[in-house]
């Protein structure tokens, strides 16, 4: 029998629902009685912002689907119809396309925060793995959605990415044909990608988001000091250094969400193309199998991996390095041998390595947008080496680093050293 939890509602209808559905316990477990550290900083805002963008993407995607036609003959024209003839269609389309870029901005910052404060370490390894699975699904969702406008750049970029599967030994060619449903990117491919984009992957993303949050609330949130607040409790059994997520953290989050939405809508209204980074110029032309864009590049949020692909002379090895560049994130909890979580108390080795990694990732992102010639290839190879060195050398430099003493309780204001 379920535990008898006193209802928090006074409204008769809500109390009636609460007697038949665990609404009160859900709110208590995940909001009013879920305790998080008092010293959260701005880095802890990006997880909430990712949820905000996810809602925006689902709502705008729903309305776009009402008027979009997933066929090679009608796809491009249906997008133009949405932009020109559907009431506020231009706004919905720009909210969706801008939202895709903002989604990856907040996701990358959310991942970087975990790397700053050791949020992937015990007991949060599963949270990290679920988060990475969610990241993989988001990458797939973005890729499948990228082809749907049937612009010339999305057509040829899709051709390049799908062909990478052909380098898988033994069954690569068969897998590539299965993904396309044809011998080349065609109407069949577009229909398949549409099905993945609007049904399969959104369901997978929702499931992983729920699992990610449940796992987080089961073990508790990390904090900038990397200490466990459950260790010190008051007489009521509540963490001394924790506050209820609602209303304390939700109130602060609302301020951050407001600022974020101002920036987001400024981009939507004044720079939806963002100089060709959010919406490429070549995608304003319909797909043409006989006209290759001068410079084929994927969306900017994939360009770090694209630069790694092009940095390796052998195409098959380049594809392997691309896959490894993404997969290595999953193994961070086991590659990092240091007992200390937060960068505040870690040695100079990890601080230097993480800084070099961040520089490498940003540099590769820039290089992936440039032509694969001369100095750009040489720099891409250098930063590919530093990118992989962060992961592959981690078991060694994290063992050698000299750490500071970690406080028993959270620190509310960082003291100057």
Q: What residue ranges belong to the model's regions?
A:
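Membrane-embedded and interfacial regions of multi-pass energy-transducing membrane proteins
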Residues: 2-102, 106-417
């Amino acid at each position: 029998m379920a535990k008898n939890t006193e209802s928090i509602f006074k409204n008769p209808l809500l109390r009636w629902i609460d007697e038949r559905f665990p609404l009160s316990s859900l709110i208590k477990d995940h909001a009013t009685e879920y305790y998080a550290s008092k010293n959260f900083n701005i880095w802890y805002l990006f997880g909430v912002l990712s949820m905000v963008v996810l809602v925006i993407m689902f709502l705008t995607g729903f309305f776009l689907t009402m008027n979009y036609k997933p066929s090679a003959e009608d796809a491009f024209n249906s997008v133009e119809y949405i932009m020109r003839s559907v009431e506020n269609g231009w706004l919905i389309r720009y909210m969706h396309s801008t939202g895709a870029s903002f989604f990856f901005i907040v996701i990358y910052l959310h991942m970087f925060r975990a790397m700053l404060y050791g949020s992937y370490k015990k007991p949060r390894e599963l949270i990290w793995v679920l988060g990475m699975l969610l990241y993989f699904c988001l990458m797939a969702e973005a890729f499948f959605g990228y082809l749907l406008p049937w612009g010339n750049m999305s057509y040829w970029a899709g051709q390049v990415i799908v062909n990478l599967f052909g380098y898988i030994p033994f069954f690569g060619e068969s897998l590539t044909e299965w993904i396309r449903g044809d011998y080349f990117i065609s109407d069949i491919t577009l229909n398949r990608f549409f099905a993945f984009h609007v049904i399969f992957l959104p369901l997978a993303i929702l499931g992983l988001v729920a699992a990610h949050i449940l796992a987080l609330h089961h073990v508790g949130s990390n904090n900038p000091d990397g200490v466990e607040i459950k260790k010190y409790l008051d007489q009521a059994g509540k963490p001394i250094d924790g506050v209820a997520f609602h209303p304390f953290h939700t109130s602060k989050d609302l301020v951050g969400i407001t600022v974020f939405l101002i920036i987001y809508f400024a981009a939507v209204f004044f720079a939806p193309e963002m100089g060709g980074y959010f919406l490429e110029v070549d995608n304003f032309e319909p797909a043409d199998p006989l006209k290759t864009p001068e410079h084929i590049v994927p969306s900017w949020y994939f360009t770090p991996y694209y630069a790694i692909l092009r940095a390796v002379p052998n195409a098959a090895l380049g594809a392997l390095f691309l896959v490894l560049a993404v997969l290595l994130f999953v193994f961070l909890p086991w590659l990092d041998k240091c007992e200390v979580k937060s960068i505040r108390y870690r040695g100079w080795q990890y601080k230097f390595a993480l800084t070099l990694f961040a520089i490498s990732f940003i540099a590769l992102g820039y290089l992936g947008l440039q032509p694969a010639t001369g100095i750009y290839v040489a720099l891409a190879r250098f930063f590919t080496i530093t990118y992989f060195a962060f992961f592959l050398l981690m078991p060694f430099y994290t063992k050698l680093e000299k750490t500071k003493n970690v406080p028993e309780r959270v620190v509310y204001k960082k003291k100057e050293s």
